[in-house]
Amino acid sequence: MDARTQALPFDPAALRGLSAQLLNSHHQNNYGGAVKRLNAIRAQLATTSFASTPGFQLNGLKREELIASNSMLLHELYFASLGGDGQTMEPAMALALAASFGGVDRRHEEFAAMGKALGGGSGWVLLTFQPREGTLVNQWAADHTHALAGGTPLLALDMYEHAYHLDHGAAAGAYVDAFMENVDWAPVYARYQRAVHAASEPFGATQDEVAGSMLLDVRRAGVFAQATSMLPGARWRDPAAVEHWAAELPADRALVVYCVYGHEVGRSTALRLRAAGLDARYLRGGIDGWQAAGRPLQPKPADPGATP
């Protein structure tokens, strides 16, 4: 089945610092060209006799298939990353960036600097979720064939000249700044949620499975500050600073972390703890599900981080 081009998910006339002419040309010619090239390569592969085709020809076809496939997919992610104000994001998305980079601004600074460093050359800068560690990383890619094994790209910046030359000439830095001002964090967050849920699903604990485990409340600091209760015996730890407290936890004891609903905050924290060699799981349904089931809670103590 042939791949089909996807329409721009935003009004190209509405972006700041990126003209409709540039965006339409990029979409129609470069992205559209990648889709057409991929379909042509697939058609040729469908009629190829693998037994009689010389190895160098087959290698060439498969190499070009990879290049065209990633060009199509990364362009789709690039366009799907635009249409916002560059700043507005869900608190849980900000937490994920802070937990991985030390702060949202720090993440942005590194990402933009990586893009500007590619100016005059070519390649991509990607914000990628790495499931092994439950973290986010800004990934460098010199062309369409570089990828973090097992990672899920969430945000893409195209640094090939076709992405900016019509508007900015050789001023790649101005283009990067314009891109950063137009990022739509809502779909980035949705992709992050899906990636975290897929990676963490095997590590969920039901309410009946928490007995005997060390309980860690990892609700966001702002949410926890407004809370009045916790699970009995739990202690609070900041999910934005896992690397600062993970080493304090016992390696010979099962851990269960919980957030409000059992979504990406608790799940990503469990993944990070597991990457540190700990037997960590997240509580399915979070404290909300626990309370809805009529399970007991305790008042939040004066020192919620202390060992019970």
Region spans (language model):
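Conserved protein kinase catalytic core
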Residues: 223, 291-292
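Short amphipathic alpha-helical segments
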Residues: 226-230, 269-271
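Feature for soluble, non-membrane regions of globular proteins
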Residues: 1-200
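Catalytic cysteine-centered active loop of the rhodanese-like fold, especially the PTP/DSP P-loop
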Residues: 242-291, 308
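Flexible, polar/low-complexity N-terminal or interdomain linker segments that lie immediately upstream
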Residues: 186-227, 299-308
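Short acidic-hydrophobic, aromatic-tinged amphipathic segments that line or gate anion-handling sites
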Residues: 237-238
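Short, structured coil segments at secondary-structure junctions
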Residues: 230-232, 276
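Short, hinge-like loop/turn segments at secondary-structure boundaries
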Residues: 232-233, 297-301
